[in-house]
Amino acid sequence: IRNMEGDLGIGHVRYSTTGASVAENAQPLVLSYIKGTLALAHNGNLINTPELKWELIQNGAIFHTTTDSEVIAFHVARERVHSKTVEEAVLKTARKLKGGYALVIMSPRKLIGVRDPLGLKPLCLGKRDNTYVLASESCALTSVGAEFIRDIEPGEMITISRNGIESNKELSTGKHAHCVFEYIYFARLDSMMDGVKIYDARIRGGKSLAKSYPVEADL
C-alpha cells in the first residue's frame, strides 16, 4: 500500500454470499462508463436483485459476474448519467435497494460510504493523520493504524473528499434492526459495533443462552 500512488483507495475481502467463489466475483468492482470510472465494494445481501437486474438487462446491460454487487454498481453508473453528482446517483440507487448493505463507492475525486436504512450491515469511520477510512469493522481501522471515530448511522451517507467530510441522512427512517449474526459470528472479537464490544456481546449472549437452556455439562 505504501508504494501505491494516489490519495483515494478502495479494497475488499470477500465472504461469498451471492455468486460463486471465483475470481470474476472479486471486489472491488471497477466500471468504465460515459462519466468516467467508478469502483464499488459491497457487504450485504439484497432481496430484490432479480428485479433490479432484469431492469438493466432490458436496457442492454451485459453482466460479467454473478454478484448482486455488480447490479448495484450498474445502477449507480446509470443514475450518474442523469444526476448532477455522484452522491445524487448513489441516493437514487439506494432507494431502490431492498435488504441489508454497506457500500463504499469511489469516483476519481470522492469516496462515498452508505449504510442501509435499518443498519443491518455495519460501517464505521476512522482517521489516521489527515486520512479518513471507511470499514465494515473497527478492527480493520486498527490494522492500518487508524483511530475509530464513529459508526455510520443507519440510512446515512458519508462523502469524503478534499473538502472534508459531508453527511447526508435522507435515507434514515429512524428504525434500527441490527443483524444479530454480526455479533455472534461475522465480526472479530476485538471490534466495536454500534457502541457494543463484540467480545462482551458474545459473553452476555452465552450467559443468556445458559439461563434459557441449562444443560448438565462436564467442563
Segments the model singles out, each with a brief description of its role:
Residues 1-154, 159-219:
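Conserved short alpha-helical segments that host acidic/polar catalytic motifs at enzyme active sites
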